[in-house]
Amino acid sequence: MKKLKTLLISAVFALGVTSISGTANACGKLVIAEQNWASAELMANVDKIILEEGYGCEVELVPGATMPTFTSMNDKGTPDMNPEQWANAVYTPLKKAVSEKRLIIANQAPITGLGEGWWINPAAIEKYPQIKNMTAMEILEHPEWFPSKEDASKGGFMGCPAGWGCQLANANLYRAFDMEKKGWVLLDPGSAAGLDGSIAKAADSNEPWIGYYWNPTSMVGKYNLQQLDFGVPFAGRDNWDNCITLAEQDCSDPKPTAWTKSEVNSIVSANFAKTGGKDVLGYVEKRTYPGPVMNGMLVYMADNQGQQWFWQLLRFDHTLLPKVQVDP
């Protein structure tokens, strides 16, 4: 409990909020996307609690994922906020939506110290020590080091679940690097839990694992995943935005490339700014999770399943999180 309180207090100060004794102006009803991975779940729930307890909002959380949530916000104006929008997957349509004033980038960097890419586990390094000095492109010449559970004659590369923007990027990089011809299969984990489960199972059995992941996350820290250098330069935004991040039928000639620099935004609808008002928008603009704080919270969440009590503690223990406002 003491560890949790320390983490929570760290998170509150990291978000740039302080306790006050006064009451905030009511802001109306807001809908926030609770996306299907741990950091997004945490951010959505903390935002809900702060906006309800500190600003008098009525907040509804709705399930979400990178692409479906953005598409819904862009086309229908709902949900009102995505706390953790990985912008690389929607760079061009997001830029257009902002210019046409349908969406607002309320916070350009709500999480610090983040990044996406391809990773390997310690078992791979232990079994093949030379891999420590190899790039992803060099490792792709050795599918036999990572035999697929479905077909041991091929290497298994763990991709992203359906609905995540990285699913399209990994599928197109699979084609760009001619991985099928090299003897690889692109595996679908099915869900966030499936992706995490593949890492955990590989660790438990001390088997090599290679695939997509991102940071900050509890999994990177807990399982000591090592990010790979692609061994090729970033091939430019045109290749990335207009091919790599699109569906296969819209990306006929993907070029080999390193992963683009990761960018995460908190985006809100025009209705959010109108309904929530200046103070609520100001909170979203200023709240930031430093990477170490986020990782600490995520590790605690991962180690303590059945998290409903966690949110209740945040909501009702006002020694930790009473009425809040954004610092001037």
Where are these regions (language model features)?
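Short, well-ordered beta-strand elements
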Residues: C27-S39, C57-V62, K154-M158, V284
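N-terminal segment of the mature folded domain
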Residues: M67-I125
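A conserved helix-loop-strand patch within extracytoplasmic ligand-binding domains
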Residues: L103-G159
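C-terminal functional modules
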Residues: F272-A273, L281-P328
